[in-house]
Every structure is written in C-alpha cells, then in structure tokens.
C-alpha cells in the first residue's frame, strides 16, 4: 500500500469484462487496481480501489448495471468482504455494502459478481463461503459510505 503500482500485472489478471461501449476493464487483484483498455489494447486509465488492502487485494471481479450507459460498476472485494458501487464514468466509489460474516448480506470472500437485466446482483463466495447470494434491485436512492449488510429487510423499512 502507498507505493506506485507496477507497470505490469502482478499476477494473472483476475477478471476481464468488456462494457457495451467497447472498453475492457480488468482486475489486477494484488495491486488493488482496475485497468481500462480499448479493444485494441491501448491503455486508457487505471484506478486503485481500497489502496490500503493487503494480502489478496481488493479487485476480484466486476460487472455493469443493465442501463444503456452502464452507469454503474459493481466490484467484488473478497479481501475486505464487500461490494463497491462505482460510478463508471468517473470511477468514483459511491458506496459499498456487505461485511464479513455468514448471515444474509454478509460475505466470506466474495469472489464473483454478476448483474442481470433487471439490475439484480448475484455474488458467489470462495474458500469456506461456498454460496450464492442474490441482492434484489429495489430502485435508486441517495447513499454514501459503507451501508453494511443490506439485511434484514425490515430494518431498511423502519421495522414495519
């Protein structure tokens, strides 16, 4: 942490996803870095996520929101046990959800992430997590920071 990221990937790339506008996003997990390239391999930019993360890094897998502009990127971070919601145009982390644990909405090494056409988010966990979770899209709202576990549902609605 705190050092200039290497010019090359530290290990084999852990994820590579193409957005609808033809940009390729990759996860350089141990460098806590998402690199963006054109289809022809031309470098566009790189972005460090959770720079103080040690060990296995913060960038495990990513996917995009289903809207036409793919406004949002969802990033699985197995080391810090959360999902980041990132504004794709600026690569700003808007908020995150999750924490370490085995209850619904918590993660034990969230490893993979996918978003369906309705905006529902699916995550898988590795090591001893060994499960899939579905986070149902319920609309847009202003949030920031780490919202913690999106569970139980009755807490979100004020207990009704």
Predicted regions and their residues:
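Eukaryotic scaffold repeat domains enriched in small/polar residues
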Residues: 1-160
